[in-house]
Amino acid sequence: MLAVSGLARSTFFDHQRRFDLPDKYADLKEQITTIVHDSNATFGYRRIWRALRNNNTIVNKKVVCRLMREQGLVSKIRRKKYNSYRGTVSHIADNVLGRRFIQDAPNKVWVSDVTEFRVAGTKVYLSPVMDLFDRTILAHTLSTSPNTQLTSRSLADAIAMFSPGKGLIVHTDQGFQYQHASWRTLIKSVGGVQSMSRKGNCYDNAVMENFFGHLKSEMYYGASFTSVDELCQAIDEYILWYNTYRLQERFKGLAPMQYRNQTLAKTLTV
């Protein structure tokens, strides 16, 4: 056979020896596959590398990338957006935030927005409130109507749970819900300051837009939901997972709530 193929005897046995060797990356491949599965295929190689490090598995990023490619493991990608702008209904606030998305402490700047889902011929709306310090979703509400109760309830819940101090900035777009007196009254009740993106400028609330992009690509697009309840449960579960498990490069590989708790623990020991 070797004579027919023209393959050198030494080359044949060298390849044969390699095939017979145990795969030195077998355990690592298994870990990577588990992380991909646990993250619902939302982690790219960088987050998987971080997760491995958090589990005390030290490996080069390039190795993780190569092994994922060899196993056909790819992360989901993203797609577009609900617009709640209805013109100037009441009050338009200044853009106090001014794209200062990096904050040095919790409860200094909160951002919010509304996004839309479709299931079984019905529209479902999500209103989350996020802390820019650690990107934690502090509270969220779901409804089949994008009314002022939807947005006010999520902000009221966040205030009740996290007790922000005076001077809190609450930033949104110019959606009609945020021009309403109920929203402005809630902000004033804690001595807060209202901030709004400039008209039609999604980059002024880019962090929340980014969260919506991740949420939809990671748990909604490509999935099959048969009812409003099923979709709402999946969104609730995703937000819990995002807060407690979704690793963030900017936070040295910690999930939002991990980073928040670590920061608060340091503050208490000072």
Each language-model region and where it sits:
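Mobile genetic element proteins and their domesticated derivatives, centered on retroelements
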Residues: 1-5, 12, 32, 48, ...
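K/E-rich alpha-helical interaction surfaces of small helical-bundle regulatory domains
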Residues: 1-19, 58, 234-254
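Generic alpha-helical secondary structure signal
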Residues: 4-11, 27, 182, 189, ...
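Active-site beta-loop-alpha junctions of metal-dependent nucleic acid enzymes
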Residues: 122, 141-163, 169
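C-terminal domain-tail junction helix/linker
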Residues: 188, 214-270
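An active-site-proximal beta-strand-loop segment
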Residues: 99, 103-138, 144-146
